[in-house]
Each structure stands twice: as structure tokens, then as C-alpha cells.
């Protein structure tokens, strides 16, 4: 039997970038094409926080489960939602990509 280490939470978590029940808007475009076209620019409600690797993601780096009426639910990275100014979302996305590829991001070099 394979055990899934994911942690799915449906209540507020101190330190998470959003609150359950918060209204959020999905960014209007996806440069890398990872967001389903039908969700782009849509507004929905946060219904869950998903931590694929709780040891490294909890509490501030979850996937955010969003329910969009008439479309259903999908998971989004924080930078794929309009929670912060675009410049901040871009910095977060660059950092996340650098971490995935094993490099150091400019955020890690800051004092």
C-alpha cells in the first residue's frame, strides 16, 4: 500500500497566504499554460489548502483549492491568484521555479 503524505486542510491555517472562504480571482493569463483556460480570470472561493510535502510547505506554501461556481474546483499556486501585486507574484513564481530546478533564487540571496 502506498501512503500519500499530502495534507489537505479545510480550515484556516496561521501563516497561510489565504483564508478559507476568501474570495479570490484567478490571474487572467498563464504564461506557462499550466492553468486551465476555463478558470483564467474567474472569481471563486477558497475551500481548501493542499500541502503535497507538508514538511517543506506548511504553513505558508500550499496549493490553494478554489471553487468557481459553474466550473468546479481546481488547485492553484498562490502566485496564480490575485492575492498580491503582479510584481510580487512574479518574484514568487521565479523563486518557486529556481527551487524546483535546484538553483538559488534571488530571494535566497537577500540579506
Swiss-Prot record:
Entries under Pfam families matching the protein: SH3_18 (PF18354)
Cleavable signal peptide: none
GO biological process: carotenoid biosynthetic process
Keyword Nucleotide-binding among UniProt keywords: no
Keyword line: Activator, Carotenoid biosynthesis, Transcription, Transcription regulation
The keyword rRNA-binding is assigned to this record: no
InterPro entries (alphabetical): CarS_antirepressor (IPR033807), CarS_SH3 (IPR041199)
Matches recorded under CDD domains: CarS
Factors inducing expression: By light.
Function recorded in the entry: Involved in carotenoid biosynthesis. Antagonizes the transcriptional repressor proteins CarA and CarH by preventing their binding to DNA. Can also dissociate preformed CarA-DNA complexes. Does not bind DNA.
Oligomeric and partner information: Monomer. Interacts with CarA and CarH.
Protein's UniProt name: Antirepressor protein CarS
